[in-house]
Amino acid sequence: MILIVVLIAVTSGLFLLNLNYKYWKKRGVPGPKPTFFVGNLADNFLVKKSLSDLYAEIYQKFQDSRLVGIFKANTPVLIIRDPELIKDITVKSFQHFHDNDLFLDKNIDPLLGRNPFFLKGEEWRSTRALLTPGFTSGKMKWVYPSLEEVSRDLVTYIDKHQETTSFKAKELCMRFTLNSVGACAFGLDAKCFEEDNPEFKQIGDRFLVPEGFQAVKAFLIRMIPVLRKMVSFRITPKDVEEKLTNIVRQTLRYREDNNIVRNDFMHILYQMTKTNSDFKEVDATAHAAGFFVEGYETSSVVMHFLLYELAANRRVQLKLRQEIDKAFDENDNTLPYEELQKLVYLDAAFNEALRLHPPVGSLRKVCTKAYTYTPKEDEMIKSFIIEEGMIVILSLYGLHRDPKYFTDPDCFKPERFLDAKKDSFKYVFMPFGEGQRACLGQRFGSLQVKIGVAYIIRNFEISVNGNTQLPIKYDPVYILTLPKEPVWLDFKKIR
Ligand code: HEM
């Protein structure tokens, strides 16, 4: 009897699973054939390819479609290919797609759970409004002297070590961004150029890497989304949470006891704890931690890809050095904030590195209010409803390498950004996202990467070391776009 019940349950389960696989067919939306149980993401489940690589592959296969229907396990998901539709989702119809497909309970992960990236609805809106004043261009000018100091320390650090060894680019850039975030967010010297493994680096090495059991939970939640509400999942390791909380607590106390005012993000948070009774110490800690994790990691990823591309493309490196040298030479061997803003070729090279290697390879939005998809006249699809709760994917990696928008899409050619008319890459080049949910730290991230690279190019000739495995393949597991094997660079002092 039990056997019969189990058989009936399994057969009905299989039947229902297969039934769901007709979801897109019924609506006439094109898409790749799903594999039973895993849907279209088998290569990610088997740790062969990153999700961003997979979405981009699917994006590329369906050249003539505005959207592609796929299955994550047996859940229907939409990949949006059309820039006009992307504009609608991120800007015009934002009220239908205002949340990210990410879930962290702030009672379980109090630091990242309070981060705007993970927050939803009204809570996201009010937190974003609270933090936005910390990222104005005025505030960037405020922290710029700290960034200059850290950049000079970077040059001294490379200088000291380059005789004996070449550098793992990501690690070098991470030391730089950790020091700059330490200075600009916490008002502290993170000592990443002095010690081999200082506390900030230990925290940085572990922050975004869910360990053991948490990684298994993350995988299960991805496969079976209903588990989100049943399984307690955290990204921030417990000991990292304790260390960061202590750093913030001590800094706030020290400032209070000694009446210290510094030009940094912590001062803004400190003021909020004094002026807003709803803003508690745990909020200050969470937002300082948010600045920490978003500030060092994405920027160090971008910076190391930019250095790699400059090392691999000598012509671009030389041209960039001419621009940078001129600015330093005309300003007493310094690079003032206003001068950095004028470096158009540096800006183009930065954008081109972001185009080729966007750290966030895909954006996953959730439909928060049913949305009617209206096809164009030449489409073979009827109008249909994108239901509340459906996940829509914007494949940044797919868009950024689409030959329809970028000629020779796999080549590093900063000139394309110089020649382009304003806004011509809108909604096809969007490394920071678009619309109300776009990256809050874009100004700070761009500033620290550009100043760090400017100081390096001013002082060193860089080349790719033979230890680098080419062509670069992306890590299938890490949540950001990162090479599976490290990029090694050689530095030759020229000044
Ligand atoms: C160059 C480096 C960076 C890149 C490429 C980058 C990219 C992104 C992307 C793609 C998003 C998602 C946008 C969306 O959902 O539409 C995002 C969100 C966010 N980023 Fe960045 N980011 C960078 C640096 C930073 C820095 C330095 C900070 C802060 C110090 C920061 C803070 C945030 C926050 C708070 C969000 C969530 C915004 C929201 O949901 O309202 N980012 N970033």
Task: Locate predicted features.
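Central I-helix of cytochrome P450 enzymes
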Residues: 177, 181, 186, 240-248, ...
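Cytochrome P450 heme-thiolate "Cys pocket" and heme-binding signature region
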Residues: 133, 289, 382, 419-449, ...
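Conserved cytochrome P450 catalytic core segment spanning the I/J/K helices
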Residues: 42-43, 49, 57, 136-138, ...
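Cytochrome P450 catalytic-domain helical core, especially the substrate-recognition surface
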Residues: 32-57, 76, 103-186, 198-253, ...
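Cytochrome P450 heme-binding "Cys pocket" and the immediately downstream C-terminal segment
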Residues: 314-316, 425, 442-480
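Conserved cytochrome P450 K-helix/beta-meander segment immediately N-terminal to the heme-binding cysteine loop
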Residues: 394-421
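Conserved cytochrome P450 K-helix E-x-x-R motif and the immediately C-terminal K′/meander segment
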Residues: 44-64, 246, 250, 335-380, ...
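N-terminal membrane-proximal hinge/A-helix region immediately C-terminal to the signal-anchor transmembrane segment
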Residues: 2-112, 122, 126, 148-157, ...
